């Protein structure tokens, strides 16, 4: 579990949880209440 900002814009392994401009997290990540979770 990694903390993330409201926009879910964190980086994991060099890739953003949610690329800028995207409304949903990608790369196997999901944002839940300011947390980026691996799914």
Curated annotation (Swiss-Prot):
A single cellular component GO annotation: extracellular region
PROSITE patterns: HWTX_2
Record carries keyword Secreted: yes
GO terms assigned for molecular function: calcium channel regulator activity; toxin activity
InterPro entries on file: Hwtx-2-like (IPR012625)
Keyword field contains Nucleotidyltransferase: no
Keywords for this protein: Calcium channel impairing toxin, Disulfide bond, Ion channel impairing toxin, Neurotoxin, Secreted, Toxin, Voltage-gated calcium channel impairing toxin
TM stretches of this protein: none
Disulfide-bond pairs as recorded: 4-25, 8-31, 17-36
Tissues expressed in: Expressed by the venom gland.
Family, similarity comment: Belongs to the neurotoxin 12 (Hwtx-2) family. 06 (TXP1) subfamily.
Note, other: The primary structure of the mature peptide is identical to that of venom protein 1 from Brachypelma smithi (AC P0DL80).
Functional description taken from the UniProt entry: Inhibits voltage-gated calcium channels (Cav) in rat cerebellar granule cells. Has insecticidal activity.
Protein's recorded name: Omega-theraphotoxin-Asp1g
